[in-house]
Design a protein with these regions (language model features):
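Expand to "…catalyze enediolate/carbanion chemistry for C-C bond making/breaking, isomerization
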Residues: 1-292
C-alpha cells in the first residue's frame, strides 16, 4: 500500500472542459476523470478527446490523475486505453470488476502502450459478484487499489441506505479486509447529499474507522470536510509523539512497554504512531505544493 494519502478523490466529468479547468484549483488529493457514467453514449468519443487535450495541457499539480475508462466489454473501453496512453495518467480505474481476469486483461492491453508503462490499475468494486470475489481481485498482482461504487452496489443488492449504512457494512468490510491483506489502497464510496455537511462528516468518519484510506466525492464542496476526516487530528499527532517518546524512554530502561494516558504502549502502537506522524508530514508537504 502506498504511503501517499488519498483522503479525497473527486469525480470530474471527462468531457466537460469547464469542470476540467476548475479541477486544477480544487485541493483534492486525487481526481477521477470519468469517461464512464458521467458521459452519455453519444459523447464518449468527443469526451475522450477533450480529456486527453486537457491532461496534456497539465496544471493538475501533485494531484493523482485517475481516468475511469469504460468497461472492456463496451464499444469504448479499448479505445479509451489507446487514447489516454498519450496523456500518461497515474492510474486507470476499471469499472464494474467482477473477476480478477478482467484486471489481467486490462494489464495486458495497457502493456502495449509506452505511455502506460508506469500507470497503475484500480478496480471499481460495485457489483455483488465483484464483492464476493474481492479477495481474488485484490490479490491480482497488477492491482494497486480498489474504489467502492456504493450507488451501483446498492441498486444491484436492492438495499436501502440509511445514515449508518448498516445494510452495506458487510460488503464494505469485506473489501477493506481484502485490500489490507493484499497491501493495496482502498477508497470509500460517494455521499450523494452534497449539501449535507453533517451527514458527509459522519459518513467520512465512519469510512475512516472502517479502515478506508479516503473517500470518493461528487462535488468540490465536499473536499475540505473529507480531507480533515482522513487526516490525523492535532490530538492524534500529539498522542503519537508522546507514545514514541515514552516507548523510547522505556526501552532505554530495559522495559518492553510504556504507559501513556493510563494505557499500555507496545511496539505495535509505536509503529502506528510513526505512521501517523509520517502521514501528517506528507499531507502538509502535499498541501504546500498543491497550493503553489
Amino acid at each position: 500500500m502506498t504511503s501517499r494519502p488519498y483522503r479525497s478523490v473527486l469525480y470530474i466529468p471527462g468531457g466537460r472542459e469547464s469542470a476540467l479547468n476548475k479541477a486544477r484549483n480544487i485541493p483534492t488529493d486525487a481526481i477521477i476523470f470519468d469517461l464512464e457514467d458521467a458521459v452519455a453514449a453519444t459523447e464518449k468519443v468527443s469526451a475522450r478527446k477533450t480529456l486527453v487535450q486537457q491532461l496534456l495541457v497539465g496544471g493538475y499539480g501533485r494531484r493523482t490523475k485517475i481516468v475511469r475508462i469504460n468497461s472492456l466489454d463496451t464499444p469504448w473501453g479499448f479505445g479509451d486505453i489507446a487514447a489516454i496512453a498519450e496523456a500518461t495518467p497515474d492510474i486507470i480505474l476499471l469499472p464494474k470488476v467482477n473477476i480478477a481476469a478482467e484486471i489481467l486483461e486490462l494489464g495486458v492491453e495497457m502493456s502495449k502502450y509506452e505511455g502506460l508503462k508506469k500507470t497503475k490499475i484500480w478496480a471499481m468494486m460495485e457489483t455483488p459478484r465483484g464483492i464476493l470475489n474481492a479477495p481474488e481481485i485484490a490479490d491480482c498482482i497488477e492491482l494497486d487499489g480498489m474504489v467502492m461504487g456504493t450507488n451501483d452496489l446498492a441498486k444491484d443488492l436492492n438495499i436501502r441506505l440509511d445514515s449508518t449504512r448498516s445494510s452495506m457494512l458487510s460488503a464494505l468490510s469485506l473489501c477493506v479486509l481484502a485490500a489490507r491483506a493484499a497491501g493495496i489502497t482502498i477508497i470509500d464510496g460517494v455521499f450523494n447529499a452534497f449539501k449535507d455537511d453533517t451527514g458527509l462528516r459522519c459518513e467520512a468518519v465512519q469510512g475512516r474507522d472502517l479502515g478506508f484510506d479516503g473517500k470518493t466525492l461528487i462535488h468540490p464542496a465536499q473536499v475540505d470536510i473529507v480531507n480533515k476526516a482522513f487526516a490525523p487530528s492535532s490530538t492524534e499527532i500529539d498522542l503519537a509523539q508522546r507514545q514514541i517518546v515514552a516507548f523510547k524512554e522505556a526501552s532505554e530502561n530495559g522495559l518492553g512497554v510504556a504507559v501513556v494516558d493510563g494505557k499500555i504502549v507496545e511496539n505495535l502502537h509505536v509503529e502506528a504512531a510513526h505512521a501517523t506522524i509520517k502521514k501528517s508530514e506528507i499531507i502538509i508537504e502535499m498541501e504546500i505544493l498543491t497550493n503553489k
